[in-house]
Amino acid sequence: MKLMVFDLDGTLLNTLPDLTDSVNYAMQTLGLLTYTQAEVAQMVGSGMTVTLTRALGKQNLDYLAEAKKLQAEYYAEHCNDKTAPFDGVTDMLQTLAANGIAVAVYSNKDQPFAEATCAKQFGTLVPYVVGTGPDGVIKPDATRLLALTQRIGADRCLYCGDSDVDVLTARNAVMPCVSVTWGYRTRKQLVESGATILCDTPDQVLQYAQKYFA
């Protein structure tokens, strides 16, 4: 079975507007400084606990538990207000499916958020969604991803993401990694993290996948 595994935030979906709003809701409610989307973009990628830890800074870490509660409450209601696929992503997923390549998402979002977001944005185009479970284990740990590949019998896999975390995740899963440059890390950051296959558009990702799985 051929399987293409995608990161979600910054790879398939531009979730940054809603993520920024949710972080800023927590920060503002606590009477703390808020952030621009560009600033939040550099905080995301390792789960919301890490994002909020970065947002709060060392001097405000006592607020972490409350910030997590506030952010989660807001995001549950607004996680798809402004979120949308990047241009060309839906067509890419449709073509992959037509070529007999199954699609999975491997995300640091909590499982319910990951499932709800994929269902709303992509319907049946993403049949396999793996988010963070109750144990709180996040990428770059590849345990949940490898469990999925074993469960569905995927023996040829390709990983695609937009961050250094994804490069490490693919390495831990022993999968080739396609790094996309339209997400929340710069090309320079990706190269410095060890990325060797870089694509600037979903069409380039599709072309690489078609050659890889040929």
Q: Which residues are covered by each model-predicted region?
A:
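Substrate-recognition element of Asp-dependent hydrolases with the DxDx(T/V) motif
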Residues: 92-119
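Substrate-recognition "cap/lid" segment bordering the active-site pocket of phosphatases
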Residues: 82-84, 110-160, 164-173, 187-189
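N-terminal helical cap/lid subdomain that shapes the substrate entry/recognition surface
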Residues: 1-91, 99, 112
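Glycine-rich phosphate-binding loop signature in dinucleotide/nucleotide-binding domains
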Residues: 99-101, 151-156, 212-214
